[in-house]
UniProtKB/Swiss-Prot annotation:
The record marks R27 as: Transition state stabilizer. This is Galactokinase. Mg(2+) binds at S135, E167. Keywords: ATP-binding, Carbohydrate metabolism, Cytoplasm, Galactose metabolism, Kinase, Magnesium, Metal-binding, Nucleotide-binding, Transferase. InterPro entries: Galactokinase (IPR000705), Galactokinase_bac (IPR022963), Galactokinase_CS (IPR019741), GalKase_N (IPR019539), GHMP_kinase_C_dom (IPR013750), GHMP_kinase_C_sf (IPR036554), GHMP_kinase_N_dom (IPR006204), GHMP_knse_ATP-bd_CS (IPR006203). The keyword Ubl conjugation does not apply. GO terms for biological process: galactose metabolic process. It comes from Limosilactobacillus reuteri (strain DSM 20016) (Lactobacillus reuteri). One of its GO terms (molecular function) is galactokinase activity. The active site is at D179. It comes from the Bacteria. It is an enzyme of class 2 (transferase). It catalyses: alpha-D-galactose + ATP = alpha-D-galactose 1-phosphate + ADP + H(+). Belongs to the GHMP kinase family. GalK subfamily. The gene is galK.
Amino acid sequence: MDKQQFLAEYQDVFKEPGKDVFFSPGRINVIGEHTDYNGGHVFPCAISIGTYGVYGPREDTTVAIYSANSAKEEDSKIITFDINDTEPQNAKDEKWVNYFKGMLVYLKQRGFKIDHGFNLYIHGFLPYGSGLSSSASIEMLMGNILKDEFNLDIDEIELVKLGQKTENDFVGLNSGIMDQFAVGMGKENNAIYLDCNTLEYKYLPLELGDYEIIIMSTNKNHSLAGSKYNERVQECEEAVKRLNKKLDINKLGELDSDTFDQYTYLIDDDTLIRRARHAVSENERTKKAIDAMEKGDLEELGRLINASHVSLKYDYEVTGKELDTLAENAWNQPGCLGARMVGGGFAGSAIAIVKKSEAENFKKNVGKIYRDKIGYDASFYDAEVVDGPHKL
């Protein structure tokens, strides 16, 4: 779809021309899962599948939002709120609007002048609950539209922080900053090596040669805010609290494996030990993956990606039958260097690094196994690594 098509869709809904069209990407994370809120390292990139938004200013103080994605539902409607309303939408069919509303609320709280309403038409191509950061894509889309329309003097990293605040405080999910950072700071053909504790980062070319990344969606929805995601955050915080009987740390990402092994006895709970062990070992795997990328050692990268999935399955327990079926059967396919779940888990998506010449057979074989075992189809996506949010 092109810019004119989105403008035409906006006009169909709001009966007047739209002003501008923006795109905000989704993201995948090559490695470093559930490490962001633990103060560790991650290695994500922005992808060409994302969210498009068309907006047009209004003369009153009403914000009116329409989603083409909810148009498939019988109760599709334009949802409205006032720019001075600071409370989350509570109706079940309106909660998705809070990702937009939170950004507006927190920008106004920061003292930015947002003095009129607007209409907003949304068309997302990231399946909701796919683990590809549809929520961060929406937050950064909204932030960049507001920045453009109201000439806000704010840089992208500050918008990223407000995106995380929206997720944490307005929506109620205790996530780290990786998703918003990956989306907001995306750079074409590069992944971002990010220290989530300090926000120090560097771009690394995602040079895979004869290989490509294939996204595999379980087509099973996950709702992180209603899942065990927040429980994992709390378990890691409790592990830190127990380790601090002898140590002085704020996050598990501050530990290496040797130090963790030395003081594991302080945690004194098998479940908490496994949760913390994942956070520490995944952080180390991410650092090793960067070394492998810089040396061009894709086979080592693949091994680390596989080990990440194993840790997420057994120590962190966030995979599930669908994700395990995709990742573990991907491992057995010709030309696959590595595969693992991505995102929060509990369904959603996995990624695989696959030889380009084997890609079609890979999709066919893994797809058949998944359908036979799970009972419905998985979806497979090829995505390019792209820049962050921008105006078309």
